[in-house]
Amino acid sequence: MFNLLTLAAVLSTSMVFTTPASAAVSSVSAASEQVCHFAPVADSAASLQHTQSLGVIYSENTVSNLQYLNNYHSVALRSGQNGALDSRIRNAFISSSDPKLAIDWLVGSLKKEFASVTVYDSLDALMQARPDVVVMLDTYNRLVSKRNSQVEARFMARFYDTNLQYIGKAEGEVVREMTSVWVQGKAAPEIAAQIDQQRDLQVNALKQFDASLKALVMQADRAQVAAN
């Protein structure tokens, strides 16, 4: 029977092979790997402006993180087969491991601040498109499992000029140690509420990112006004 302890064991196994910080992602293309290794040799004199076009690419860590979330999410979806797991617990696992939550939020936040935002599959494709600013999105999540009770959400956007020189960054980060959800005797609503905290934590980190992004753009606005 696929109960909570079975789910814990499966999630723990999934964590071993897909932890974002160390996973080897076979699906990463050579072009995707290429973007993960470029590094600015100096800070850029360019500034951010609302009228700019942004070309976005995912870091290697983000590609790995998305695989981790997809694996975790798939386990959560399968956990409801034959009604073996309380629906409230299952739904909490599904909601808190949504692979699209952070990426959609981050891209949406960029779209609110800049004229256009396009996500590219490779650095080559991005550079050929010649956007005004290059953005590398870096994401990291760590969710609860039988072996882990520390939940982490770290999101960062690094901005570069057309020569890949560093302009600045926006970021948000929340880390929290959670009480174990695997203790026998806990009621389903209590377990579901604990698991839901994973999503709340991610949202809090994303809100931090939004505030950081606004501050970065506002700083550029003020610098431009002072220069005129």
Label each region the model flagged.
Residues 23-49, 163-228:
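C-terminal/domain-edge helix-coil "capping" segments
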Residues 1-5:
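Positively charged n-region of N-terminal signal peptides that target proteins for export
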Residues 62-63, 140-145, 174-180:
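Solvent-exposed loop/turn segments at secondary-structure junctions
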Residues 91-140:
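Short, solvent-exposed, polar/charged sequence segments at loop or secondary-structure edges
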Residues 26-36, 122-169:
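Surface-exposed short loop/turn segments
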Residues 6-16:
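Bacterial N-terminal signal peptides
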Residues 16-20, 110, 117-123, 213-228:
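An exposure/low-complexity boundary signal
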Residues 19-103, 217-228:
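A structural "domain/chain start" motif
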